[in-house]
């Protein structure tokens, strides 16, 4: 026989559109029992004997609403509320009535989304706030990825949440986990989607190419469904509370080194509250797809028109190419580490490493223009020479 709490859970799940088989599977009871109580107007009774009326009876509909619809299971709070409505009974009868509802709610009040090995990864950002690093104020963000089955966590601090950093963080998470899941669940990020059209998600073009390259299906949370990516949200809170608070660091590199060491030695070794098993143990069961041989290029992309003298402007600076590219359009690719590569029709034509000292391109342009001016020869003109007496005669009106 099912409990009264399970009876109301069956009703609620059925109203939400779940099938009889799914309800039976979630609650661990027989399908015939589910079918029976779906159409039953009353909860099951332990005894067919006529029960005495309870002082709590008039307040049970209110209590059911508060527990099942509002999620309130604090007996002290509910006791106070029904006392305000005229209840004269004690607390014990209230607690006994609430017990089956509370137990069922703990088991499955909101249906937990459990995934199969390798099926899903959840990702999200956390805006940490402004920090001072090497004398400069920067906005710090935390990226977190969690595998749905094992709860294995990867995280990294960055100074940007733009699309290029998001893709790079995803690549590093795939490498950390040793493969790619079938699906990756996102919040409704502007770096992933271009919004919705008549309820249908419009995927960002470059991000769609990225997802296809790694072979995963991108998914976004349904609006107002906070539980959908609860695993990664809990992971974010766990990292902030147990790692970030009180951690001293002088650079982002040092902060991430400490974070990754903590993930390896603490966070991913601690048994999960739901599974009872550490993420590292369950991680061995994840069936992830292999990574491609080459990383996707997450560089910033920018097209530039080359001027007649081979120069073009990028980020407020003048750059110089050979004259053969004059009037042509080139592609500038800037990696997240600052390295810059120039391309024309898919072929690399120049590479500037941020780690090396770069000669001022403005100086190169000035030098080239000077050289070009020096190659222009002055026009040679032959002039006849005459004695000055000829010009004097001309002024007096005399002709020769």
Swiss-Prot record:
InterPro entries from the UniProt entry: HTH_IS21_transposase_type, Integrase_cat-core, Resolvase_HTH_dom, RNaseH-like_sf, RNaseH_sf
One GO process term, biological-process aspect: transposition
Annotated HTH IS21-type domain residues: 5-67
Single GO term (MF): DNA strand exchange activity
Segments for region (Disordered): 35-55
Superkingdom of the source species: Bacteria
Keywords: DNA recombination, DNA-binding, Transposable element, Transposition
Cited Pfam families: HTH_7 (PF02796), rve (PF00665)
Function statement: Involved in the transposition of the insertion sequence.
Protein name: Putative transposase for insertion sequence element IS5376
Native source organism of the sequence: Geobacillus stearothermophilus
UniProt lineage: Bacteria, Bacillati, Bacillota, Bacilli, Bacillales
């Amino acid at each position: 026989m099912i409990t009264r709490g399970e009876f109301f859970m069956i009703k609620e799940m059925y109203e939400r559109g779940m099938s009889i088989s799914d309800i039976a599977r979630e609650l661990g009871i027989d399908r015939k029992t589910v079918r029976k109580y779906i159409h039953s107007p009353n909860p099951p009774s332990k005894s067919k004997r006529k029960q005495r009326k309870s002082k709590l009876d008039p307040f049970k509909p209110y209590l059911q609403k508060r527990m099942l619809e509002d999620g309130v299971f604090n007996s002290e709070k509910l006791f106070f509320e029904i006392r305000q409505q005229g209840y004269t009974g004690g607390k014990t009868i209230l607690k006994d009535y609430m017990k089956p509802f509370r137990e069922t709610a703990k088991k499955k009040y909101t249906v937990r989304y459990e995934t199969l090995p390798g099926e899903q990864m959840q990702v999200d950002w956390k805006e940490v706030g402004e920090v001072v690093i090497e004398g400069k104020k920067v906005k710090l963000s935390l990226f977190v990825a969690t595998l749905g089955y094992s709860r294995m966590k990867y995280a990294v601090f960055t100074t940007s949440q733009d699309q290029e950093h998001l893709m790079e963080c995803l690549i590093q998470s795939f490498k950390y986990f040793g493969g790619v899941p079938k699906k990756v669940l996102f919040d409704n990020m502007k770096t992933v989607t271009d919004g919705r059209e008549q309820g249908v998600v419009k995927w960002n073009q470059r991000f769609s190419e990225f997802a296809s390259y790694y072979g995963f299906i991108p998914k976004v949370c349904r609006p107002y469904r906070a539980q959908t990516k609860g695993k990664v949200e809990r992971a974010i809170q766990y990292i902030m509370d147990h790692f970030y608070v009180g951690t001293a660091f002088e650079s982002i590199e040092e902060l991430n080194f400490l974070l990754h060491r903590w993930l390896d030695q603490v966070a991913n070794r601690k048994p999960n509250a739901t599974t009872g098993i550490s993420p590292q143990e369950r991680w061995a069961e994840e069936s992830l797809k292999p990574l491609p041989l080459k990383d996707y290029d997450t560089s910033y992309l920018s097209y530039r028109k080359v001027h007649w003298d081979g120069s073009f402007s990028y980020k407020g600076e003048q750059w110089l190419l050979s004259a053969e590219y004059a009037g042509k359009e080139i592609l500038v690719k800037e990696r997240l580490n600052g390295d810059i590569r120039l391309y024309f029709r898919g072929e690399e034509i120049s590479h500037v490493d941020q780690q090396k000292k770069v000669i001022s391109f403005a100086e190169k342009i000035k030098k080239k223009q000077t050289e070009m001016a020096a190659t222009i020869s002055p026009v040679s003109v032959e002039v006849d020479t005459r004695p000055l007496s000829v010009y004097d005669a001309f002024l007096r009106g005399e002709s020769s």
